[in-house]
């Protein structure tokens, strides 16, 4: 549909009204510049990044603004801005449609990992073909919410996937227990001395976190503040997200 001239003239007022309604729905007025940041901001994010990177950082933001609340929605699916499921969404796929503001938040690296004891008792992995002797841990294929997490077929189609889970944390714990090899985010697995990278040069992937919010949310001070804070986190954590 195309707006008429009258419609275009009314659009700013309509957007302002919608922003005010959103503010009331989140428990605070749309304009919080004088009273400080207040109300609720919902942030949708992938499980690993939300748990390990964002949650500790957001604690700082909520300490600075005691009247601000954050709902961190770390769920294994794509949240829909159009349905108001979140105010800000961090995803692995760039939104291609809708009236949204989108920015690149950060890249992050993933590698193939195995428990050191598991690797010691199983055949040596010197090249990709050696992976056929190993068990794997991965996602549940028919519940995968984005093609960006399809790694194993690119690496070496496994003969046996010993354990599947929609949760990256569950996959990580299974690998720690010796269930098999898995592609895990470096920011999750590199910190663990129990794990070691496998084929570190060949079995490496880089993905991108995209951050988006509805265009009308730019009128909300608290949403703008959380957006800017998350951008800062992405910049500050860049070396951790893509380590050497």
Where are these regions (language model features)?
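A bilobed periplasmic-binding-protein/Venus flytrap-type ligand-binding module shared by bacterial periplasmic
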Residues: 209-221
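Short, well-ordered beta-strand segments
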Residues: 42-44, 89, 137, 182, ...
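Alpha-helical "hinge/linker" immediately C-terminal to small N-terminal DNA-binding modules
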Residues: 2-30
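Immediate post-signal peptide segment of exported/extracytoplasmic ligand-binding proteins
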Residues: 34-41, 132
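Short amphipathic alpha-helical coupling segments at ligand-binding clamshell hinges
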Residues: 218-232
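C-terminal regulatory
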Residues: 83, 95-209, 235-244
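Short, surface-exposed acidic/glycine-rich loop or hinge patches that mediate macromolecular interfaces
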Residues: 8, 48, 216-217
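Central regulatory/effector-binding core of bacterial HTH transcription factors
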Residues: 38-98
């Amino acid at each position: 549909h195309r707006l008429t001239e009258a419609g275009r003239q009314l659009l700013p007022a309509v957007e302002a009204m919608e922003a005010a309604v959103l503010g009331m729905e989140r428990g605070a007025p749309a304009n919080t510049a004088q009273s400080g940041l207040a109300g609720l901001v919902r942030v949708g994010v992938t499980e690993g990044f939300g748990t390990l990177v964002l949650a500790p950082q957001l604690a700082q933001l909520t300490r600075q603004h005691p009247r601000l609340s954050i709902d961190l929605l770390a769920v294994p699916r794509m949240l829909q801005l159009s349905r108001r499921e979140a105010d800000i969404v961090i995803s692995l796929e760039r939104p291609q449609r809708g009236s949204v503001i989108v920015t690149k938040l950060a890249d992050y690296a993933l590698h193939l990992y195995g428990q050191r004891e598991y690797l010691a008792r199983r055949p040596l992995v010197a090249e990709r073909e050696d992976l056929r002797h190993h068990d794997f841990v991965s996602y549940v294929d028919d519940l995968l919410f984005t093609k960006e997490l399809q790694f194993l077929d690119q690496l070496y189609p496994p003969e046996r996937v010993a354990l599947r889970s929609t949760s990256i944390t569950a996959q990580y714990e299974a690998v720690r227990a010796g269930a098999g090899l898995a592609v895990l985010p470096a920011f999750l697995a590199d910190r663990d001395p129990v794990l070691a990278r496998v084929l570190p040069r060949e079995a490496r992937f880089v993905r991108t976190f995209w951050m988006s919010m509805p265009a009308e949310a730019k009128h909300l001070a608290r949403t703008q503040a959380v957006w800017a804070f998350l951008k800062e986190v992405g910049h500050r954590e860049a070396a951790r997200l893509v380590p050497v």
